[in-house]
Amino acid sequence: MKILPHVMRNINEFNIPAGNSHGYEILYFGVNLILMFKYRLSFDIKVQNSAKEIEILILGRNDIPAWKENKDNSEIKPYYNKNGLKINDVFRPTISDAYAFVINNRKSSISHEVKTVEVILTHNWKQEVKESQLKEHIKTQG
């Protein structure tokens, strides 16, 4: 058995309107801590065109329908919650789950303001791989 590092990076730019109905963007990801050792999600968020902060939430995917309906989030316990113009942080989940990374502009006081947000997500983990799987992969690539 070998343990191989894995890295997956997503770079996006979103235009997120204000308001409750469409003032957010959701990126889904899944983590299986049995297969993905030392998983971490690093993220770098930057509001490009505004002096008003954006909110970043990480929720369980099953909480998303309730979050969309609930304006104050009081019934939902997020795994992560932070506001800012620039957010550079790391999320290390403690349980395997399907997660939702939410860029939230629903609280914006300016109803017509569309925020341009640069989002860089980097998923890192280690995975145990059998030697035979490596050899088979090398054969198919060559």
Label every PLM stretch briefly.
Residues 1-142:
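Acidic, Ser/Thr/Pro
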